[in-house]
């Protein structure tokens, strides 16, 4: 049987990795030869989850057409966030919870996108719909994905469906969601030992906003000053990325997991759009974004609207 690769976006977060593993397992249970892979490095937060539930991380690939003809996307759909040669393979399915942009296919496909906080929440439903029992380890990874995407249920993207799914999965996994979740988030917020290049690419995504090319990177921290003390070095590496990729804006967002506020560092010729979008003034290229924790709900749509205004 021909193999199908299942993967999340580049610079994968916990949902991208864990949902690839969970969905590949579901597809295997349903008779497909599916393998989860990843398009980037595994973050400290994700590694904590993999280690905790004793699951091996997926192998890394840069291209997919050299291995398979068919792929399944989880936690993304936009081409620039996917495999470098995504145009050379057939996308069989997409399971996602983001905006739909820069995506089209030549054939009809199974496309499931729901306005929930996490792909794993959708997968929890799909396991039930197919009558497949979720293994303890996989339930733990799916729980980890929901906790990560919802910032332990505090993000505005978090829905009642996400909370309910997390409680179900925590029971299967045999953990206390709140206690485990805080440990996992703290592991992810430990940025010691990371280079500046790693910091700005840990969780970075590219977007087309009107005619502008924008990259938004986000890291979680227990204290934003722990990251911003390196601002001069950060600006240097961000400026290099802006020039290399021809970006109009690179927004580096440092989110405080205790206060649920963020600080944005904006570099690029369109940095003023951040001021316009949030009604703030950039001082030394930074501004506090009160109550902003979600790139998907509080950054991407707000900036997109500002660019198109």
UniProtKB/Swiss-Prot annotation:
GO terms for cellular component: cytoplasm. Mn(2+) 1 binds at residues 9, 13, 75. It holds the Pfam family DHHA2. Keywords: Cytoplasm, Hydrolase, Manganese, Metal-binding. Mn(2+) 2 binds at residues 15, 75, 97, 149. It is found in: Cytoplasm. It is an enzyme of class 3 (hydrolase). Belongs to the PPase class C family. This is Probable manganese-dependent inorganic pyrophosphatase. It comes from Bacillus cereus (strain AH187). The gene is ppaC.
């Amino acid at each position: 049987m021909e193999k199908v690769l299942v993967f999340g976006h580049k610079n994968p977060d916990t949902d991208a990795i864990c949902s690839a593993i969970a969905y590949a397992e579901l597809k295997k249970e349903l008779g497909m030869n599916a393998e989860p892979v990843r398009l980037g490095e595994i973050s400290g937060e994700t590694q904590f989850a993999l280690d905790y539930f004793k699951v091996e991380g997926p192998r890394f690939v840069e291209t997919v057409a050299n291995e398979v003809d068919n792929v399944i996307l989880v936690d993304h759909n936009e081409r620039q966030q996917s495999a470098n040669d995504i145009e050379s393979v057939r996308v069989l399915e997409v399971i996602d919870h983001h905006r739909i942009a820069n995506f089209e296919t030549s054939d009809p496909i199974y496309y499931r996108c729901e306005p929930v906080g996490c792909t794993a929440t959708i997968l929890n439903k799909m396991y039930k719909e197919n009558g497949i029992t979720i293994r303890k380890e996989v339930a733990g990874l799916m729980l980890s994905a929901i906790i990560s995407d919802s910032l332990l249920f505090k993000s505005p993207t978090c829905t009642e469906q996400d909370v309910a799914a997390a409680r179900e999965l925590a029971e299967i996994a045999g953990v206390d969601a709140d206690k485990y979740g805080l440990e996992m988030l703290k592991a992810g917020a430990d940025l010691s030992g990371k280079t500046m290049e790693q910091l700005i690419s840990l969780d970075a995504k590219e977007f087309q906003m009107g005619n502008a090319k924008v990259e938004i990177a986000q890291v979680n921290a227990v204290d934003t000053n722990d990251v911003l003390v390196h601002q001069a070095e950060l600006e240097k590496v961000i400026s290099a990325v802006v020039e290399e990729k021809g970006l109009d804006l690179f927004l580096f967002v440092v989110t405080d997991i205790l206060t649920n506020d963020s600080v944005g560092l904006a570099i690029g010729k369109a940095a003023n759009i951040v001021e316009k979008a949030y009604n703030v003034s950039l001082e030394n290229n930074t501004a506090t974004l009160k109550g902003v924790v979600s790139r998907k709900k509080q950054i991407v749509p707000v900036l997109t609207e500002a660019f198109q205004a």
